[in-house]
Amino acid sequence: IPGLVGSEMCIRDRYSVVGRQKYDEALGFRNSYEGPEIRPLGERCIVGFGSSGGPPKLPVLYNNLTQIVQTKDYVILLAEMNHDARIVRLNQDHYQPSFNPWLGDSVGYYEEDSLVVVTTNFHVPQNLRSSLDHRFYGSTSMTVTERFTRTANDQILYQFTVEDPEIYSQAWSGELPMNNSGEQLFEYACHEGNYALPGILAGARRADADGVEYAPTDPGRQ
């Protein structure tokens, strides 16, 4: 899926029967306003919208900058969106499957000039990655393999492959360039200014009191 254009259309046909069912069920929860715990993670300022923090790292409408910090034992991928920091442990083993951190469990190694990062053990609430630009579903045992390859002084080629036999009938892949913007990251102070979620829930309670049905979420806009 070069450039990730129309990515949802490209992977829609790759869902298994079980995968499509779970995807539809997860998308249906977006029409529930019973409380904050059931609302999307981006609305709750827990992780960024969609898959902006990765893996795979996919662009959204804004705050797409990523700062890469490297030490002898770790690589940190800091996304400007919600300040998601993914720590990649170099030349280590994965944790036990029962350990499911936000953004998954990432381990990496170098293959010639490419940094290869393999991530699995995803956190259950992150099964549905949904934004205006992309949307897909993955199980906790989904495996994402990423490759970061410098192609110029100011560019890294980012490539990834998603494998999840329970959800997809075959693997799917994509790539996009990561260009050096020369800009600094700004603080994404989500909780401090999050008036949207209280407003969403207050609107739902008013609709309940008035006996009004919620307008269904347009899947093309979520």
Whereabouts are the PLM-identified features?
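Positively charged, low-complexity/disordered segments
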Residues: 2-6
